[in-house]
Regions:
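Bacterial N-terminal signal peptides that target proteins for export
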Residues: 1-9
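Intrinsically disordered, low-complexity segments enriched in small/polar residues
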Residues: 20-66, 71-77, 85-141
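Bacterial N-terminal signal peptides
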Residues: 8-16
Length: 141
């Protein structure tokens, strides 16, 4: 019996140290790369505008020093899929995917699928958080 308790305690301790993908409520991002980076986030709300286009909310830029973690969406996760794009301009490196989302060179919040002429698109990657209340996404070299 004591051996089973010791094993269970060891497993629980290992899970706490590893910072598992579902450690706390909210969506947390950690920069585990060796360089500073900036991140844009986006969310397809599932709603449509009056013209029938999807309402996608994108925001940026969030600055992350190497080793830094921060919450991008707080509280219990309301959606299954979240979109991210990361870049380190000085290192000419990107964390990207295949979903085009509108961004701006300056800090921004865009609430449309349309991309005005003074904005541009970057290729975001999708994070599937499953049915979890919280998620930690790590960006690595």
């Amino acid at each position: 019996m004591l051996r089973k308790l010791a094993i269970a305690a060891g497993v629980i301790g290992a899970m706490a140290i590893s910072g598992g993908a579902q450690a706390q409520n909210g969506f947390r991002l950690c920069n585990l790369s060796s360089i500073n980076l900036e991140v844009a986030k986006a969310l397809n709300t599932g709603n449509k505008d009056p013209a029938g286009r999807p309402i996608i909310i994108s925001e940026g830029w969030y600055q992350f020093a190497k080793g830094e973690c921060a919450v991008l969406w707080s509280g219990k996760l309301q959606y299954r899929y979240y979109l991210l794009y990361g870049q380190a301009k000085e290192a000419n490196k990107e964390w990207k995917g295949d979903i085009p989302i509108c961004v701006s060179r300056q800090p921004f919040t865009i609430t449309s699928d349309l991309c005005p002429p003074d904005k541009y698109r970057r290729m975001f990657f999708q994070v599937d958080t499953g049915e979890n209340d919280g998620w930690t996404q790590n960006l690595r070299d």
